[in-house]
């Protein structure tokens, strides 16, 4: 019998921002930031979101897990300091939890505004707020090339088929609004995923990520009042040719009813190459 979120304690009902295809079935212009951050191609759906603390979620089965990590850092405004001091912390925490042989943290986002700041004329994001569109950061197509640029050809040759991309997400202060929600990987079938590709002006591929359509049976979870010592670790991609469904986790921020006047969420997320 399939697991039911509704049967658990601490369930909330919230609207999630899913992707809506064009009426003719064609894909939208993925370079248009309103497709990712604005109101274009938006399908707002009411869903049940369970309490992640209610179960022992596992990376290998569910695609995500909740782990303890008390950081020595409290100020994340200096990007170079984050790279120098926080990256090693996160890498060690991931290695300890997963048994990975090598972890390379390669970028991060600090989110401390209520909404992303869009400059639609320049087609850029001026500041980063909670990402409310349901998505998966990485989709097949251009991933190996991007990783090669960051980690080098020697890494790709040595660890081919053995690495994953994971996100490590934690609050900078206790979350009171716009929490992160993640979906049990197996509850989101491949047919609900749309590979959206962004291209540079010269026509080369810039980014490939999954948008997510609403579907029956998606199982969503979040951490109520998530504390600074609680880190959500979730998988976005696997280089293993026999990759499983738990290797891509849909996620998004969502509006928690009744919290709109609470302090703005502050969080830090690190993306890492994890070698097994």
Curated annotation (Swiss-Prot):
The keyword Oxidoreductase applies. GO terms for molecular function: oxidoreductase activity. It is an enzyme of class 1 (oxidoreductase). Pathway: Secondary metabolite biosynthesis. It catalyses: 2-[(1R,8S,14R,15R)-11-hydroxy-14,15-bis[(6E)-oct-6-en-1-yl]-3,5,9-trioxo-4,10-dioxatetracyclo[9.4.0.0(2,6).0(8,12)]pentadeca-2(6),12-dien-8-yl]acetate + 3 2-oxoglutarate + 3 O2 = phomoidride A + 3 succinate + 3 CO2 + H2O. Phomoidrides A and B (also known as CP-225,917 and CP-263,114) are potent inhibitors of Ras farnesyltransferase and squalene synthase. CP-225,917 and CP-263,114 inhibit Ras farnesyl transferase from rat brain with IC(50) values of 6 uM and 20 uoM, respectively. CP-225,917 inhibits squalene synthase with an IC(50) value of 43 uM and CP-263,114 with an IC(50) of 160 uM. InterPro entries: AsaB-like. The keyword Oxidoreductase applies. Keywords: Oxidoreductase. It comes from the Eukaryota. Its EC number is 1.-.-.-. Belongs to the asaB hydroxylase/desaturase family. Alpha-ketoglutarate-dependent dioxygenase; part of the gene cluster that mediates the biosynthesis of the antihypercholesterolemic agents phomoidrides which are dimeric anhydrides. Within the pathway, phiK is responsible for the iterative oxidation necessary to convert prephomoidride to phomoidride A. The pathway begins with the highly reducing polyketide synthase phiA that catalyzes the formation of a C12-fatty acyl-ACP, starting from one acetate and 5 malonate units. The hydrolase phiM is involved in the release of the C12-fatty acyl chain from phiA. This is Alpha-ketoglutarate-dependent dioxygenase phiK. The lineage of its organism: Eukaryota, Fungi. The gene is phiK.
